[in-house]
Amino acid sequence: MISYEYPLSERIRTLLRLEDLFRKVAHFGGSEAPLDHHVALLTIFEILEVASRADLKVDLVQELERQRQILLSFRNNPEISEEALAGALYEIEQASTALLSMAGKIGQYLRENEWLMGIRSRAAIPGGVCQFDLPSYHFWLNRDAAERRHDLDAWIMPMTPIRDGIEIVMRLLRSSGRPEQQRARAGTYQLTMAGRVAQMLRVRIPRSEAVVPEISANKYALNIRFMLPETVARPRVAEREITFELTFCTL
């Protein structure tokens, strides 16, 4: 099954983007190749850009506190494992404490690093980070992999409370919904929301169906068109019946 997630609010859209970027930093930063570390650094710059667009830290702290209060209401419930509940509460409290301990604007320490900001500025220009443009960066890329990883860790670590908070919120959001089997006719699925509240949709499709969902949704209606995965020609609707799994997620 291939899973597609569609945010229904700007806040969840931002969290999904940051979650994806943090995963890419972990993937490319864990490599030893200079070009992978180059991608990791550029991705850190993307995190800096996305995280600065919203009052992210406050939103995460407030959401974690809301979830903590919900979990506290389950105490002394015989159907809930006290050990699992205590573990979840501890994780949320640790993440909240770490977020509250972050001083100043997210990533300000990066903005104050003139060398990094010089690379960021050149990276905005197509082909702007060639060795003749940034010889000091070329030198850095030719240092030992362990030294580069040490630097990358130092640049990303102060933002790990953001990453950890996002991981908790998104895990809770994803686990909140109940999958429903649905069927699209002639490659199209439509649903009237009728007061249904959701912050994110998840569509899961068997690989064998070989289609890509184009999702549009608002508080009134949900529309999904299942397209044939073209890489050259213009995508076309797969005009056949398609079975898929639909989940409405909300906190």
UniProtKB/Swiss-Prot annotation:
GO biological process: division septum assembly; FtsZ-dependent cytokinesis
SUPFAM superfamilies listed in its UniProt record: YacF-like
Top-level taxon in the UniProt lineage: Bacteria
Keyword Transcription set for record: no
Annotated Gene Ontology cellular component terms: cell division site; cytoplasm
Main localization category: cytoplasm
Entry keywords, A to Z: Cell cycle, Cell division, Cytoplasm, Septation
UniProt KW Amino-acid biosynthesis keyword: no
InterPro entries assigned to the protein according to its UniProt record, in alphabetical order: ZapD, ZapD_C, ZapD_sf
Compartments where found: Cytoplasm
Function: Cell division factor that enhances FtsZ-ring assembly. Directly interacts with FtsZ and promotes bundling of FtsZ protofilaments, with a reduction in FtsZ GTPase activity.
Family, as annotated: Belongs to the ZapD family.
HAMAP family given in the database record: ZapD
Assembly notes: Interacts with FtsZ.
Protein name, entry field: Cell division protein ZapD
